[in-house]
Amino acid sequence: NPRQTIQGAEARDWVVQTSFDSLHLGIVRTYWYIWTPAPYPLLGMQLTNDSGAVKGLRIVEQWAVGSTWQGCTDDGSVTSCALEKNGVPATVAWANAVTGSFTPPAGLSQACSTANECVPVSGPVELTETPVRFIP
């Protein structure tokens, strides 16, 4: 539906999810339809300089650019991808369906949302389809 509005946190999360799904699946480029200075009436997800979608691109940049990609695992319920940036390990994980349980690797004790809000974790974490970054 081209007249559906996809904005804010939903747009941010969809961009992060699409980007990490693409990396996981070996898709080296993901193109967005249009980037405009102001919202365009026919598109559902707007890429403008201050949109939620662009905030998603900034999160992907912070989490992945400059990292060494160490591959992904998919247990059928959760996909997790290991990265290392400047010697610091991280894992990005998300549920393949509505929810899934994931235990972060040893040493990764914080879970960071796509809003870059981090909380301490230990043991299994319930994930949704929105990627979460686990860091030391």
Regions found by a protein language model. Give the residues of each.
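Beta-strand-rich binding/interaction modules
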Residues: 90, 98-120
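Proteins with a high burden of low-complexity, intrinsically disordered sequence enriched in S/T/G/P/A and R
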Residues: 1, 37, 95-97, 112-115
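Aromatic- and carboxylate-lined catalytic core of secreted/periplasmic carbohydrate-active enzymes
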Residues: 13-100, 128-133
